[in-house]
UniProtKB/Swiss-Prot annotation:
Name of the gene encoding the protein in the UniProt record: petJ
Family: Belongs to the cytochrome c family. PetJ subfamily.
Organism: Pyropia yezoensis (Susabi-nori)
Alphabetical list of NCBIfam families matching this protein: Cytc6PetJCyano (NF045930)
Gene Ontology process terms (BP): photosynthesis
A Pfam family that the UniProt record links to this protein: Cytochrome_CBB3
UniProt name for this protein: Cytochrome c6
Gene3D superfamilies: Cytochrome c-like domain
Signal peptide: 1-25
Keywords: Chloroplast, Electron transport, Heme, Iron, Metal-binding, Photosynthesis, Plastid, Signal, Thylakoid, Transport
Xref: PANTHER family: CYTOCHROME C6, CHLOROPLASTIC
Gene Ontology cellular-component annotations: chloroplast thylakoid lumen
The UniProt record lists the keyword Plastid: yes
This protein's record includes keyword Electron transport: yes
Amino acid sequence: MKKKLSVLFTVFSFFVIGFAQIAFAADLDNGEKVFSANCAACHAGGNNAIMPDKTLKKDVLEANSMNTIDAITYQVQNGKNAMPAFGGRLVDEDIEDAANYVLSQSEKGW
């Protein structure tokens, strides 16, 4: 009986992990679409057309404490300085997907 439960648990674990990875990949795909449609005009390639020193590059995000999903999500929802707020224009899921995409791209060096 223990062996059957162990096998069942192992199969179930692989199933859950597989779907979690698919969902995460889909989030990055959506994040890229949201970023391209709403952010790329000012932030193409992780740059910043308005404030060139405030890029989305990994070292700059870290230096400005913007290297977490929560920090990026908050900034996108509420805006700051020249950056408009997108909280009323985009749903929370799209903003979080875009934040995940930004962090992923910053890790890859854009």
